[in-house]
Structure formats: C-alpha cells, structure tokens
Amino acid sequence: MEHSTEIILSRVKISKNKLLKFLTLLRIVMTTAIPKAFEGIVEVDETYLGGKWINKRKHVKLRQKSKRGRGTSKQPVFGILCRSGQVWAELIEGVEAEDLQPRIEKQVKKGSTICSDTWRGYTGIAAKGYVHRLVNHGKHEYSDRKGNHINGLEGFWGYLKRKMAAKGGIRKSRLHLYLGEYVWRYNHKLLSLKEQENMLNKLIFKHIWSEN
C-alpha cells in the first residue's frame, strides 16, 4: 500500500480493478481497529488536511481565503495521543467544544490528564472529570518543565501529512479511509511485517464474517 498502484500491478498478477477493491477493503478494516479508551497522560489537538494554496484551482481560490489553522476551509481532523504511543484520529465538522469534548469523553477515561493548547474548544474539560494542562503556543511555548506538551501528537500530524502528500491527491470521500490507514500504521509501527499481515488477516476475516 506504500507503493503506487502501477508498481504493485507490475509485481502481482491481478487486474487493476480487483487490486483497487482489495486496497479499499484493507483501508476499511484498518479504520475499524479503534484503540481502547486511553488513560494516564494524553495529548489532544486538531490539524487540517488539504493541498497547498498555490495548487488550488482558480474557482476554489475565488470562494475561499488563504488561511492557516483554525478558520481555514480545509478539512479539520481531531486527534488524541496517549503517551504510551497509541493515537486516535477522526475527521470532524468543526473545532468547537461541542465537536471536541464528546470525543475526548468517549476515547479518554475519566481522571486522565489532558494536555492541549489554549484553544477555546477545550475550555471546561476539567469540569468533566479530567486534569487539564495547557501549553500556550501563542507565546511560543511547546513544553514546560513538568512535561506538559503536545509534541507527540504534532509528530503524528507531520507523519500523516507527509504520507498524504505522497499520494498526490485524495478524494474527500475517501479521506477517512486514508486517515484510518495511517492511524493503523502508526499504532502498529513496532510490529514486523509478518505480525502486521497476521493482524490484517484477522481484521479482514472479522469484517467479512460481520457482513454475512
């Protein structure tokens, strides 16, 4: 899956249509492998996916402004990273408290420590049973002496964007599948290829069984 369709086709005897269907199936089952609820110290943050402004088509340029970060018209993604190394991420519609905090409550156990920047979408999360630690990026603060930071999650965002960029363009309707793929790859990066293959085979079997 890290190679182009053309390269894979040159190595296996299968039609392009069947290959594309199989790759789609792999990405579908990867999206079902949701990590168990995190606990301990976790990092939360959002990012935005989309091509560079210079590559936008003219009609897109005319209807939207060139912005970075919150307020941009790009696709927002919300992520949660546990300091153990596991990450969870999901495409979201907005970045306000009503978009972010229900997802935190679902994916992070009460009593855990939430590390975030000072975005208003996280205001009030401490009242919901969490310890909340802030990192003020506006003051160029990326960590404090107590280990409160979101550097791990920002590292994942960098990994995700490099992988997405290497694909050369992804349809919005399929964006969630590629997000699921790279979350899965990141969470299982320490496994051997054989171990990853065995896990995927189990996921495929489970998916096919549930469909029947």
How would you name each of these model-derived features?
Residues 1-212:
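Residue-level recognition of single "structural anchor" positions
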